[in-house]
């Protein structure tokens, strides 16, 4: 698909720019870490990707193996969906989605409609067809508001760590690794994004210090310790007392 070619070229271009800043003297650590984390950033989870993952034949085969399902016996799989208004609006074309989310009233109204936990039996024909149709929107994905948001966020993150490469190489590497904090879908993604933003705010606070990279590593590890990020907040509080 044209969208896949576009994504591959975009990935290569972004990585080439980083490799040009890197060197053998540093064992290309920044480039290696960037290759992994930029790829993960481009494979963000939205409704289209979640639908794609849930309708793959390999997934059903894996579940059958894990459950020890006897051949010709059909296993029934129930999925839990909990989309927020943001996930739905994220599927809109960029211009329409941007217009829609500017109104808090529209967003609240939509959230009341969609933000309800739903259990869907994905092995039933109607549910499977719905998910399959959604998964087929992969080529449309690059036109959505969510794609534009993810693209801009990724660019900001890349520009952030690239700025530290000449003088604080190790800090740049640690900022690259912070991308692992962002994962999942819906509420899980929101929590991860919040931890990522707080960790990078801490990186900015310590950026002039010789031990800046160590501090960012500590912040990242603290962010992974609990769901809400309380350990991270504690580490940030410590930083503010020493700068």
What are these regions (language model features)?
Residues 26-31, 50, 211-212:
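Short, surface-exposed acidic
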Residues 51-243:
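C-terminal amphipathic alpha-helical interaction region
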Residues 7-26, 154-163:
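Short amphipathic alpha-helical segments and their helix-coil junctions
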Residues 2-6:
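Short, small-residue-biased leader/transition segments that mark boundaries at the very start
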Residues 20-34, 169-173:
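Structural motif
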Residues 44-46:
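Soluble, non-transmembrane catalytic domains of enzymes that act on hydrophobic metabolites at membranes
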